[in-house]
From Swiss-Prot:
The gene is HN. Disulfide bonds join C178-C202, C192-C253, C244-C257, C350-C471, C382-C392, C465-C475, C545-C556. One of its GO terms (biological process) is symbiont entry into host cell. CDD domains: HN. It comes from the Viruses. This is Hemagglutinin-neuraminidase. GO terms for cellular component: host cell plasma membrane; membrane; viral envelope; virion membrane. Residues 56-582 are virion surface. It is a single-pass type II membrane protein. Residues 1-34 are intravirion. Belongs to the paramyxoviruses hemagglutinin-neuraminidase family. Keywords: Disulfide bond, Glycoprotein, Hemagglutinin, Host cell membrane, Host membrane, Host-virus interaction, Hydrolase, Membrane, Signal-anchor, Transmembrane, Transmembrane helix, Viral attachment to host cell, Viral envelope protein, Virion, Virus entry into host cell. Homotetramer; composed of disulfide-linked homodimers. Interacts with F protein trimer. InterPro entries: Hemagglutn-neuramid, Hemagglutn/HN, Sialidase_sf.
Length: 582
């Protein structure tokens, strides 16, 4: 064994230390070792941290995935439930809005037909109140107050020759007699009609009586309809009823009139409105008449006048058109003081500064002819279930939506409400609005008006308000010429031009002459059919159309005031024609 390099032995037996490692070298070695150990520990720690982080991430990802999967499952379950609920709701909506109304209408028609069948026979053995039931022929029931055309397509029209039928409107019987102001309403079960019989020529502020009739549509042997009169009432009680409007109601007719023996201009100059009358006539010969004072009348109106055109029975309410003069310092007068509506014909606009035109439009509501009263349109609304106590209110539209108040008519077609307003002020074209009411159990009801832009023809007018004038100015002119819409109006762009309506116009810009049957679109007349000789004097016209659902024939009755050279100044004539649509 090699001797130790650390120690050596000498001869004198003493020990001496051998070579020794340097202390500095040992310190460096320890430092390197520590650095190495720390590095290994650091790397190990980092690896542990990274590994733990990755494990945590994987665990979290798995949990999130599970959560997302759970949420997705719940969403799919909810979507399935919603789809099922939507399907049920669609079935309910279709049932309520389509199937049920059709079923009810079918049952109603069947019931009416059954009643018409059983209510026949001799009066002694009949179980009905009268020999003939107040029910239109079944062929017409489902074609009344319906839009004839609903496809918005382009159509052509032809108006047939007047059909020869007995007139349901009696004429005057003396040279100085006068029958004027016809009002006609056709309901699903029956029709109602009225006109004024003036005793001294056509001065309606003197003395007059009121003729009222009700009847049904029947089919003649020739195949076309006839207006069969079943009941007549002649109100000759000394009251000078004026401007009466009629409406068909369950089992009878309702009529709204006002009573006055002074000039219309004097009514506007006063401060207290004339007497308002509501008359109910039923098929069992019951006649009930009440003086009414609708909410909003006293203190607001100098005068209130029925609209002449027919009213409607709608949602258990009786609605009539009206208009009149508003007192300037009344709450209604103050509220509407700055309101005005100025329509514009884009094909024939009025030139001038807009501010000036607006001021002129505002002034047009205050004609000096009517003592500078604001002339305002309104609606008389009466709750039918309280009709015997005449619980009525006046619902006043905003003048920001309507022109100056005038005569008018309320139409109910396919459950849509429309309002015709006579063009009495400066606007020369037909005025037709879609309207919607908001009725309240307490407080003031309201109405919204949406103007239908018609520019196809003008009414005759005098002075600055002839049929050629399109600029705002104050005047009282024009003539009552109500239209009958054949199609619903749509606000959808591009199809409004296919809105069609028919009526009888007076083909002159200044004179009430040349009665002419027509069919019109918004911007152009489709067909014209003059009635009588050129220059024939005429006045008010009112039109109603219906369909024979048995053979799909369309009929229109144009009721016109025509000049008479034999008996009286006017003869009211119902002209029945067949309307062909292709």
């Amino acid at each position: 064994m090699e001797p130790s390099k650390l120690f050596t032995m000498s001869d004198n037996a003493t020990f001496a230390p051998g070579p020794v490692i340097n202390a500095a070298d040992k310190k460096t070695f320890r430092t390197c070792f520590r650095i190495l150990v720390l590095s290994v520990q650091a790397v190990t720690l980092i690896l542990v941290i990274v590994t733990l982080g990755e494990l945590v991430r994987m665990i979290n990802d798995q949990g999130l995935s599970n959560q997302l999967s759970s949420i997705a499952d719940k969403i799919r379950e909810s979507a399935t439930m919603i789809a099922s609920a939507v399907g049920v709701m669609n079935q309910v909506i279709h049932g309520v809005t389509v199937s049920l109304p059709l079923q009810i209408e079918g049952n109603q028609n069947q019931l009416l037909s059954t009643l018409a069948t059983i209510c026949t026979g001799k009066k002694q053995v009949s179980n009905c109140s009268t020999n003939i039931p107040l029910v239109n022929d079944l062929r017409f029931i489902n074609g009344i107050n319906k839009f004839i055309i609903e496809d918005y397509a382009t159509h052509d029209f032809s108006i047939g020759h007047p059909l020869n039928m007995p007139s349901f409107i009696p004429t005057a019987t003396s040279p100085n007699g006068c029958t004027r102001i016809p009002s006609f309403s056709l309901g699903k079960t029956h029709w109602c009609y009225t006109h004024n019989v003036i005793n001294a020529n056509c001065k309606d502020h003197t003395s007059s009586n009121q003729y009222i009739s009700m009847g049904i549509l029947v089919q003649t042997a020739s195949g076309y309809p006839m207006f069969k009169t079943l009941k007549i009432q002649y109100l000759s009680d000394g009251l000078n009823r004026k401007s009466c409007s009629i409406a068909t109601v369950p089992d009878g007719c309702a009529m709204y009139c006002y009573v006055s023996t002074q000039l219309e201009t004097d009514d506007y100059a006063g401060s207290s409105p004339p007497t308002q009358k509501l008359t109910l006539l039923f098929y069992n010969d019951t006649v009930t008449e009440r003086t009414i004072s609708p909410t909003g009348l006293e203190g607001n109106w100098a005068t209130l006048v029925p609209g002449v055109g027919s009213g409607i029975y709608f949602e258990n309410k009786l609605i009539f058109p009206a208009y009149g003069g508003v007192l300037p310092n009344s709450s209604l007068g103050v509220k509407s003081a700055r309101e005005f509506f100025r329509p514009v014909n884009p094909y024939n606009p009025c030139s001038g500064p807009q501010q000036d035109l607006d001021q002129r439009a505002l002034r047009s509501y205050f004609p000096s002819y009517f003592s500078n009263r604001r002339v305002q349109s309104a609606f008389l609304v009466c709750a039918w279930n309280q009709i015997l106590v005449t619980n009525c209110e006046l619902v006043v539209p905003s003048n920001n939506q309507t022109l100056m108040g005038a005569e008018g008519r309320v139409l109910l077609i396919n459950n849509r409400l429309l309002y015709y307003q006579r063009s009495t002020s400066w606007w020369p074209y037909e005025l037709l609005y879609e309207i919607s009411f908001t009725f309240t159990n307490s407080g003031q009801s309201s109405v919204n008006m949406s103007w239908i832009p018609i520019y196809s023809f003008t009414r005759p007018g005098s002075g600055n308000c002839s049929g050629e004038n399109v600029c705002p100015t104050a005047c009282v002119s024009g003539v009552y010429l109500d239209p009958w819409p054949l199609t619903p109006y749509s606000h959808q762009s591009g199809i409004n031009r296919n809105f069609y309506f028919t009526g009888a116009l007076l083909n002159s810009s200044t004179t009430r002459v040349n009665p002419t049957l027509y069919v019109s679109a918004l911007n152009n007349l489709k067909v014209l059919a003059p009635y009588g000789n050129q220059g024939l004097f005429a006045s008010y016209t009112t039109t109603t159309c219906f369909q024979d659902t048995g053979d799909a024939s369309v009929y229109c009755v144009y009721i016109m005031e025509l000049a008479s050279n034999i008996v009286g100044e006017f003869q009211i004539l119902p002209v029945l024609t067949r309307l062909t649509i292709t």
